[in-house]
């Protein structure tokens, strides 16, 4: 799979094209009989979506998601409230448009020539590919030539059906598939994971998220090239809603807020490591329970799961871990840092965790106030790894290379340059292993994603097991808990730091499975 791309250039080109087409409708606030006027008169923007980690999810009563945040900002832009309706599958989403029950569909839907004949697309803001997935250990198809309807099931309304039909007509005459009208893409992915289904097709971002909690889900092959993701609305003769969307996306693109939201949800790295993820989840089961009370005790300004992810990146939760440079313990503190924090034994789990948490808090306090609240933690982690002075150099280099020093997206791209002489020789604090700091932060984000999703699923499994045990007293919760749990939508935000986010940038595992 190609790396997911954020299409800022495409947005700019599309802006010019749509502006010409929509010019009679601008300024759209002055219209009296139009879609925007109807929305404002109603006082509500109606958006239909699908429950997924990337688009929209409710965790502990709070709402998250890339499309949700953008839709909320658009509602604010229009001066109205947002009403979100969650549907089971894509077909139901377009039914909402057809029946006049939704103004917009914001659900990670890809641009498709067949769709745009009947519905109005908005600006495109990132891209995905469609991929065939299977379970590790099962037969991996190398081509679609031998895939049939007894193996491959697709969710209703999935645009990939059009691609499959074209492939059947041009390359693979024996290709066949089944559409299950009662199941969405998430359910079908769960069935592949559980072994109930051989194959399904989903977008690369959704697959990347599933793999963080279920590393046994594997990519067999790409079915399509990269496809732009967009919102959809009804075809509108006066184009006022399209013009409003165009203005809105232009504004958030120019002020940097679109890039920040996409970094939050899509900026978590591009490599999936099956062995590493599986090892981490085993450690969550076998090692974390003993350390969890300490992480919860000392994580004051951040989510305890983030602190746990930092510790795993540092030491793999080994209190006796020691590096060649002399750093030691769960949080891998230097001797000088430990002394400055009043620690006497770096190999003592509680001392190490408390010291690491305080040191991270110190780094966060130093991050310039101009950095957005939800990105401060990433700057602090880079400073935690390579030193605050080198983080300042990275910001300075970002300015010199015409980037935004307050944008983590921009700054992290410059981190590897700190180890290259043409760059570090001109910086105040000189050489730094910036590439290691980059990998350090990205790995922590990945571990936190896995930890949050895995723990939330276990909690739900335990709750369901208790309910089933009450309904069927002959079966104990312990027996029910032995069954594999299904993937649920998972996001988490603690102390203002979002941990998910569907866009991660993922590629399928490199190791081929037989």
From Swiss-Prot:
Highest taxon above the source species: Bacteria
Active site: 314
One GO CC annotation: cell outer membrane
Function statement: Murein-degrading enzyme that degrades murein glycan strands and insoluble, high-molecular weight murein sacculi, with the concomitant formation of a 1,6-anhydromuramoyl product. Lytic transglycosylases (LTs) play an integral role in the metabolism of the peptidoglycan (PG) sacculus. Their lytic action creates space within the PG sacculus to allow for its expansion as well as for the insertion of various structures such as secretion systems and flagella.
Stretches the record annotates as Non-LT domain: 31-269
Protein name: Membrane-bound lytic murein transglycosylase F
Protein's organism: Salmonella paratyphi A (strain ATCC 9150 / SARB42)
Pfam hit, one: SBP_bac_3
UniProt record, GO biological process: cell wall macromolecule catabolic process; cell wall organization; peptidoglycan catabolic process
Signal peptide residues on this chain, from the entry's feature table: 1-30
Gene Ontology MF annotations: peptidoglycan lytic transglycosylase activity
Signal keyword on record: yes
Reactions it catalyzes: Exolytic cleavage of the (1->4)-beta-glycosidic linkage between N-acetylmuramic acid (MurNAc) and N-acetylglucosamine (GlcNAc) residues in peptidoglycan, from either the reducing or the non-reducing ends of the peptidoglycan chains, with concomitant formation of a 1,6-anhydrobond in the MurNAc residue
EC number in record: 4.2.2.n1
Keywords: Cell outer membrane, Cell wall biogenesis/degradation, Lyase, Membrane, Signal
Region named LT domain: 270-514
Family of the protein in this entry: In the N-terminal section; belongs to the bacterial solute-binding protein 3 family. In the C-terminal section; belongs to the transglycosylase Slt family.
């Amino acid at each position: 799979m190609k790396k997911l791309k954020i299409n800022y250039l495409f947005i700019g080109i599309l802006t010019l094209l749509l502006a010409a087409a929509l010019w009679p409708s601008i300024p759209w606030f002055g219209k009296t009989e139009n879609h925007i006027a109807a929305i404002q008169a109603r006082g509500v923007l109606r958006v239909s979506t699908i429950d997924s980690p990337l688009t929209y999810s409710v965790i502990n009563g709070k709402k998250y998601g890339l499309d949700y945040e953008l839709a909320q900002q658009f509602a604010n832009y229009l001066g109205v409230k947002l009403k979100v309706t969650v549907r089971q599958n894509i077909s139901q989403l377009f039914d909402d448009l057809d029946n006049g029950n939704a103004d917009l569909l914001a659900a990670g839907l890809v641009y498709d020539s067949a769709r745009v004949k009947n519905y109005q697309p908005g600006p495109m803001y990132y891209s995905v590919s469609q991929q065939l997935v299977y379970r590790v250990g099962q037969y991996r198809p190398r081509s679609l030539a031998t895939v049939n309807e007894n193996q491959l099931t697709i969710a209703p309304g999935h645009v990939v059906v059009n691609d499959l039909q074209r492939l059947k007509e041009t390359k693979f005459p024996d290709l066949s598939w089944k559409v299950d009208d009662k199941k969405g893409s998430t359910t079908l992915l769960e069935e592949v994971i559980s072994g109930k289904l051989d194959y399904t097709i989903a977008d690369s971002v959704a697959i990347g998220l599933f793999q963080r909690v279920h590393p046994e889900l594997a990519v067999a092959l790409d079915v399509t090239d990269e496809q732009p993701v967009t919102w959809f609305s009804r075809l509108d003769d006066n184009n006022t809603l399209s013009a409003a969307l165009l203005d809105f996306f232009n504004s958030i693109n120019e002020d940097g807020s679109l890039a920040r939201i996409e970094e939050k949800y899509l900026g978590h790295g591009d490599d999936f490591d099956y062995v590493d993820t599986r090892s981490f989840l085993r450690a969550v089961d076998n090692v974390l329970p003993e350390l969890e009370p300490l992480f919860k005790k000392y994580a004051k300004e951040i989510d305890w799961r983030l602190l746990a992810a930092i510790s795993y990146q540092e030491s793999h939760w080994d209190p006796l871990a020691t590096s060649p440079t002399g750093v030691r313990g769960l949080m891998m503190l230097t001797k000088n840092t430990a002394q400055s924090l009043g620690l006497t034994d770096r190999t003592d789990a509680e001392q190490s965790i408390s010291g690491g948490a305080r040191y991270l808090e110190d780094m966060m306090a130093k991050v310039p106030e101009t950095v957005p609240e939800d990105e401060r933690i990433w700057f602090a982690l880079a400073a935690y790894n390579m030193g605050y002075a080198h983080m300042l150099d990275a910001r300075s280099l970002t300015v010199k290379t015409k980037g935004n020093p307050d944008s983590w997206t921009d700054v992290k791209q410059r981190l590897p340059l700190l180890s290259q002489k043409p760059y570090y020789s001109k910086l105040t604090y000189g050489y730094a292993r910036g590439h290691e700091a980059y990998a350090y932060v990205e790995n922590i984000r990945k571990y936190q994603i896995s930890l949050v999703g895995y723990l939330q699923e276990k909690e739900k499994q335990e709750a369901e097991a208790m309910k089933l045990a009450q309904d069927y007293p002959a079966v104990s919760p312990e027996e029910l808990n032995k069954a594999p749990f299904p993937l649920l939508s998972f996001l988490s935000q603690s102390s203002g730091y979002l941990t998910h986010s569907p866009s991660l940038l993922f590629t399928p595992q490199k190791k081929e499975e037989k």
